[in-house]
Amino acid sequence: MAVPNELKYSNEHEWVKVEGNVATIGITEYAQSELGDIVFVELPETDDEINEGDTFGSVESVKTVSELYAPISGKVVEVNEELEDSPEFVNESPYEKAWMVKVEISDESQLEALLTAEKYSEMIGE
């Protein structure tokens, strides 16, 4: 199962890619495989503030609805609108096409609490 080294991970199976002061957030390959076929993705609006640990959306699969938890705090600067019409991208390409939001980081110290690829792999038993 893919766990890209350049990303950081949350205990709730979100991944974070940091570029400057912007973090791109999505869910991991492990998370999408546990959920099954994704049929709907609900995301926040651009300019919404999200707070670490709070829900910022949800992913609905044929099995269940799963909340998305913000791994960091900040202002949403971009939302992946393609997921509205193509939620299957979450299954097909969780680390590329299926990024969910881009957030302007408000507290960089929160990044230190995220897991490395190695630690995340251990957590999911890979």
From Swiss-Prot:
Protein name per Swiss-Prot or TrEMBL: Glycine cleavage system H protein
GO biological process per UniProt: glycine decarboxylation via glycine cleavage system
Biological source species: Staphylococcus aureus (strain bovine RF122 / ET3-1)
Superkingdom as given in the UniProt entry: Bacteria
Domain Lipoyl-binding positions: 22-104
Job of this protein: The glycine cleavage system catalyzes the degradation of glycine. The H protein shuttles the methylamine group of glycine from the P protein to the T protein. Is also involved in protein lipoylation via its role as an octanoyl/lipoyl carrier protein intermediate.
InterPro entries in UniProt: 2-oxoA_DH_lipoyl-BS, Biotin_lipoyl, GCV_H, GCV_H/Fam206, GCV_H_sub, Single_hybrid_motif
Entry keywords, A to Z: Lipoyl
Keyword tRNA processing annotated: no
Family of the protein in this entry: Belongs to the GcvH family.
PTM annotation (N6-lipoyllysine): residues: K63
The protein's assembly and partners: The glycine cleavage system is composed of four proteins: P, T, L and H.
Matching CDD domains: GCS_H (cd06848)
Cofactor: how bound: Binds 1 lipoyl cofactor covalently.
Gene Ontology cellular-component terms listed: cytosol; glycine cleavage complex
Swiss-Prot/TrEMBL cofactor(s): (R)-lipoate
Primary gene name: gcvH
Keyword DNA-binding applies: no
Residues spanning the signal sequence: none
